[in-house]
Regions:
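Short, low-complexity disordered leader/linker segments with a strong preference
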Residues: 1-39, 70, 395, 402-411
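Beta-alpha junction/loop-to-helix N-cap segments that form part of ligand/metal-binding clefts
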Residues: 28-32, 52-59, 71-141, 150, ...
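Extracellular/periplasmic periplasmic-binding protein-like sensory domains
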Residues: 246-319, 329-333, 385-410
């Protein structure tokens, strides 16, 4: 807190004294873009229950940084990065964000995965007026001028997944999630959506601690409820335990389908395609997405990290984030937060998932929706997709059922 107060006081004194344009006027953090380099922060869980997922996001960001540096950097400067471990704890994310912004004075930060970690740092980024580039799909119901939401809003992942299942004839839904803000808000949305579908019903809803490894009682409840499909919003290592214990009961996708929102290629590798094959996921990108840019991305990722490594939606969004920041800085001709923010409005880049564009009103991204099926080779293949990118609607204001149900943020 003292460091933050010193920062705020310095800005106040700078303004009152009307000092020169040098010094306190820049919200990049003074030393972040000095000399021939510009320094950014990377803030992800490299340890703890979320390391299984966040490591690939960090790796994609480093790959993008190295590619950009090799091509000449940003505004003639090479990118350097300071890396911090959020350790799968929201309070640690907050502490590390304070360090990156207050002590290291980085130009921007690429970071977080869980909504709990994002919410833990949100006020800190707003206090310092810096930008967090958040790479993961989330529950929506939020917009901040200090966060660029590179992952899907609920209308670009959750809502179309339920629509797809309903169209396929699934009627009985069991909701299972980790016990924190994303799954609970997602399931609030899903409950409202299912209530509006004729003949559909939620037959059960359960939550597990982030580090929970025992799922036998929950699986018994699922068996008793006999759903057509399990809607899975578990995160981290909980997914490994749940699906392996489901397999121990000899329950496969032929018996009971799952639709997951946080299982990507990395998690399939860890859990096993023999266990997950046939199940469904909803994202905006897969390693198998057929674009020229994606072929280049996958080739570069494997060349750097090994042929056995896989790309994923969050990793691709993190990779895109670094390139979108570069494009915004170059459009603005500046690393200053306000200049970069203004440059973001309507900015598009050619990404591995296809062309993506920033909505300047809410700093979310237009994205193509892709429903995927996990196959025996461990990859995910598109089985349904929108014809074009879907504009973000983080507050679901365009859905009558959401408005009528009074869907609202959960803290």
């Amino acid at each position: 807190m003292k460091k933050r107060m010193r920062k705020i006081t310095a800005l106040f004194v700078c303004g009152v004294a009307v000092l020169s344009m040098m010094g306190c006027g820049s919200s990049t953090g003074g030393t972040a873009d000095s000399g021939d380099t510009v320094t950014v922060g990377l803030l992800h869980s490299l340890t703890g229950s979320m390391a299984i997922s966040e490591g690939s996001v960090r790796d994609a960001e480093v790959l993008a940084i190295e590619e950009i540096n090799e091509a000449g950097g940003v505004l003639g400067k090479q990118i350097e990065y300071i890396e911090e471990d959020g350790a799968s704890e929201p309070s640690t994310f907050a502490t590390k964000a304070e360090k990156l912004l207050g002590e290291d004075e980085v130009a921007t930060v690429f970071g977080c995965w869980t909504s709990s970690s994002r919410k833990a740092v949100k006020q800190i980024f707003e206090d310092y007026d810096n930008l967090l580039w958040y790479p993961v799909q989330y529950e929506g119901m939020e917009s901040s001028k200090n966060i660029v939401y590179m992952g899907a809003a609920p209308n670009q992942q959750i809502v179309p997944a339920i629509e797809y299942l309903a169209d396929q004839g699934y009627k009985k839904f069991f909701l299972l999630g980790s016990d924190y803000v994303f799954p609970r808000t997602a399931n609030m949305i899903i409950n409202a959506q299912i209530d509006a579908i004729d003949g559909a019903e939620v037959v059960g809803e359960e939550y597990a601690a982030m580090d929970q490894t025992e799922f036998s009682s929950i699986i018994s409840k699922i068996e008793d409820a006999q759903p057509d499909v399990i809607i899975n919003t578990l995160n981290g290592t909980g997914n490994v335990s749940f699906f392996k214990q489901l397999a121990d009961r000899n329950i496969t996708s032929d018996d009971m389908m799952t639709m997951s929102f946080s299982i990507a290629e990395e998690e399939v590798q860890t859990i096993g395609s023999d266990i997950l094959k046939g199940n469904l996921v909803s994202w905006n990108y897969y390693q198998t997405t057929d674009t020229e840019k994606n072929k280049e991305f996958v080739e570069a990722y494997k060349a750097k990290y090994g042929e056995d490594r896989v790309t994923s939606d969050p990793a691709e969004a993190a990779y895109d984030a670094v390139y979108m920041w570069k494009a915004a800085c170059e459009k603005a001709g500046s690393f200053d937060t306000e200049d970069v923010r203004e440059a973001l409005d309507g900015l598009s880049i050619d990404a591995p998932e296809g062309t993506i564009t920033v909505d300047g009103e809410n700093q979310h991204i237009s994205k193509t929706v892709r429903i995927g099926e996990i196959r025996e080779d461990g990859l995910i293949y598109e089985v349904s997709a929108t014809d074009s990118p879907v504009d973000p609607d983080p507050y679901l204001t365009t859905y009558d059922w959401a408005v009528e149900a009074g869907v609202q943020p959960l803290e």
